[in-house]
Amino acid sequence: MHAASQTLSVGQKAGWGLADMGVVVFVIVKQLLVLSFLTNYLSVPVGIAGLLTTSILIFDIITDPIVGYLSDRTNSRWGRRAPWMAIGAVILSLGIIGLFGVPQSLRLYGTIIWVGSFFGLATIGFTMVAIPYGATAGEMTLDPKERSTMMGFRMAFASVGILAVSYTHLTLPTRRGV
């Protein structure tokens, strides 16, 4: 995608901003729901659950600039960002399915390894989507006013995602019932 100074349609800006709803949903899953899921549903002790989630967040801090660097240097017929986002979406989806699809037959350490592996997979998939996605605004237009409007749509949809996940988090059942 090459930046141009043409005006983007409202639909293009809104469509671009809508993607951030999915991005923010996973951020909240990563920072809120996984810890609750580990402790309230899987009965993982709080200290171990905290160590696991912190380790994955540190992993995320390391992988973000690496993916940004690699995506900046990708040359493909689909552009620099699209291959990363497409592959990342598949990896993220598989990671989320595995993260919340923990076999009940696992004991504590098996559960920790399972969740840690799939949480790490989901996190790298998320990074492969979110980092290139964030860079696309500058490639869609050179006009700072257009990019500002795009960011407005992005933040509006992010807010909707935050509200939706916040409500869902309050209604999630635990192993002991609602």
Regions found by a protein language model. Give the residues of each.
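Membrane-embedded alpha-helical bundles of multi-pass transporters/translocases
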Residues: 2-170, 175
